[in-house]
């Protein structure tokens, strides 16, 4: 009897193992894995990285090639199912390519973050930077969008998804890490991007309250 009581007390005092979490990677072709074999895409590589680093998580691919922030907002509610614990939000690249007014992109991202916040779902916002050829006003507005939203919603943000893929000698995206289109990373580039983002994703998952 004493032995049984001791076992019960020991189990009660032991730390409980966390449930497996669900992380939604929500974005465009960078998330979806455009131009890559499935296993080499961003989501499978992130899943492998997180598992190797001890995270009990399933990463779901909610990337749609060509999606804008408006498109993302239109499908965001479908993604917010009860099993979603955290979101990695990477949208805005196609808005940039199309020259969409940053004010519109900001409003769409704001609406998505508002929805996530209402459900207490932690979000990591993946930032981007506009090139100078859009003009100084456009660039300033676009570049400020991500840090401003992160500050408003008190969420973490990455400065620039592509920063780890830049050749520091040329200050341009490394051709060794990019597909021939110059817009999407190749398998090697995906690994570099995942290695850069991974620690922040671990921090995001640590904020989940089950």
Name these PLM-found stretches.
Residues 17-65, 75-83:
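Serine-esterase "nucleophile elbow" of acetyl-processing enzymes
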Residues 13-15:
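N-terminal signal peptide c-region/cleavage motif recognized by signal peptidases
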Residues 6, 41, 188:
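Active-site phosphate/pyrophosphate-handling residues
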Residues 45, 55, 71-210:
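Alpha-helical cap/lid subdomain in secreted, periplasmic
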Residues 66-70:
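N-terminal helical cap/lid subdomain that shapes the substrate entry/recognition surface
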Residues 1-5:
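Bacterial N-terminal signal peptides that target proteins for export
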């Amino acid at each position: 009897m004493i032995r049984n009581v001791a076992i019960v007390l020991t189990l009660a005092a032991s730390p409980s193992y966390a449930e497996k979490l669900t992380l939604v990677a929500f974005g465009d072709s960078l998330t979806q894995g455009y131009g890559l074999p499935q296993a080499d895409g961003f989501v499978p590589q992130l899943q492998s990285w997180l598992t190797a680093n001890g995270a009990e998580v399933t990463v779901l691919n909610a990337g749609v090639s060509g999606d804008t922030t408006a498109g993302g907002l239109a499908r965001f509610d479908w993604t917010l199912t009860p099993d979603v614990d955290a979101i990695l939000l990477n949208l805005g690249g196609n808005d940039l390519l199309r020259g969409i007014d940053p004010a519109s992109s900001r409003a769409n991202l704001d609406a998505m973050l508002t929805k996530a916040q209402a459900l207490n779902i932690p979000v990591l916002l993946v930032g981007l930077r506009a090139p100078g050829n859009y003009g100084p006003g456009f660039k300033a507005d676009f570049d400020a969008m991500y840090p401003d939203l992160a500050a408003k919603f008190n969420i973490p943000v990455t400065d620039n998804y592509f920063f780890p893929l830049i050749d520091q000698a040329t200050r341009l995206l490394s051709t060794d890490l990019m597909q021939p289109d110059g817009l999407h990373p190749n398998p090697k580039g995906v690994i570099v991007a995942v290695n850069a983002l991974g620690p922040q994703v671990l921090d995001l998952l640590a904020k989940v309250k089950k």
